């Protein structure tokens, strides 16, 4: 389909870092900060996926409307 592999590795990397930070903060007793880190990581990934979907829709629109 042409999805760049770097994007998959970026998402996996952010997930690993968020999981690591969440575990450390949770063990330190900072559960509120751990939840915030998880939420911010999720929002960051959500925006990454939204830009990818936006690019996909632009390509589909260009194909069906014959626009460059």
Curated annotation (Swiss-Prot):
The lineage of its organism: Bacteria, Bacillati, Bacillota, Bacilli, Bacillales. Pfam families: SpoIIIAC (PF06686). Keywords: Cell membrane, Membrane, Sporulation, Transmembrane, Transmembrane helix. This is Stage III sporulation protein AC. The keyword Membrane applies. It is a multi-pass membrane protein. The gene is spoIIIAC. GO terms for biological process: sporulation resulting in formation of a cellular spore. InterPro entries: Spore_III_AC, Spore_III_AC/AD. It comes from Bacillus subtilis (strain 168). The keyword Disulfide bond does not apply. One of its GO terms (cellular component) is plasma membrane. It is found in: Cell membrane. The chain crosses the membrane at residues 5-25, 33-53.
């Amino acid at each position: 389909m042409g999805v760049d592999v770097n994007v998959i590795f970026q998402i996996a990397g952010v997930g690993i870092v968020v999981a690591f930070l969440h575990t450390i903060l949770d063990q330190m007793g900072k559960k509120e900060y751990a939840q915030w880190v998880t939420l911010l990581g999720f929002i960051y990934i959500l925006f990454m996926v939204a830009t990818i979907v936006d690019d996909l829709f632009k390509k589909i629109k260009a194909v069906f409307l014959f626009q460059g």
